[in-house]
Regions:
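Mature extracellular or lumenal effector domains of secreted proteins
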Residues: 1-196
């Protein structure tokens, strides 16, 4: 596990597209990637971590212009394997908008294990990444990031690696991201004045 002082644990990082996030169930259960570059910690580890008391979540985002935003949630928990790692998240604050609200109380879906509530498609297959989908998403930070060159010709492809509530400057790609980092911490363990 990667920690950053006083109880912070990073469980997802994307920054350069060198690690493939379009993977199956077992990879997401066990984790993959490299802690010093891009990785997913693993749903089993995330469940074990968040089951030890109240945890908060912070989502750090950076778009293709270098603009940054964050979302913070005062309550974050992942269920165990029997719940398909169901997400519990609430208590939003921040600058990125609440793009996880609609994902609350939904199970984790991968390309080979369809747990979303969409009746006709597997959202993970459709959007090329595993996530806590409903029908299908308001955020998808494990999706295929295709917006590096701002694909103006294929708008729909720019709707994959995203946090949809983050809109500003009326740009069509304002909610698509080059970098993301998901952190959890136990409030009692976070030192006063700790900055991320």
């Amino acid at each position: 596990m990667e920690t950053d002082g006083g109880g912070w644990t990073v469980f997802q990082r994307r920054q350069d597209g060198k690690v493939d996030f379009y993977r199956g169930w077992e990879d997401y259960v066990n984790g993959f990637g490299h802690f010093n570059t891009e990785f997913w910690l693993g749903n089993d580890k995330l469940y074990k971590l968040t089951s030890r008391g109240q945890y908060e979540l912070r989502v750090n985002l950076e778009d293709f212009n270098g603009d940054k935003a964050y979302a913070k949630y005062s309550n974050f928990y992942i269920g165990d394997k029997s719940t398909n790692y169901k997400l519990t998240v609430n208590g939003y604050s921040g600058t990125a908008g609440d793009s996880l609200k609609r994902h609350n109380d939904h199970a984790f879906t991968t390309k080979d294990k369809d747990n979303d509530t969409h009746s006709s498609v597997n959202c993970a297959k459709n959007y090329k990444g595993a996530w806590w989908y409903y029908t299908c998403h308001a955020s998808n930070l494990n999706g295929l990031c295709l917006c590096l060159k701002l694909l103006n010709k294929t708008k729909n492809k720019c709707n994959v690696c995203c946090f949809k509530q983050y809109r500003y400057f009326a740009r069509p790609y304002a909610f698509n991201f080059k970098r993301s980092k998901l952190w959890v911490f136990k409030p009692a363990e976070c030192p006063q004045g700790h900055q991320m």
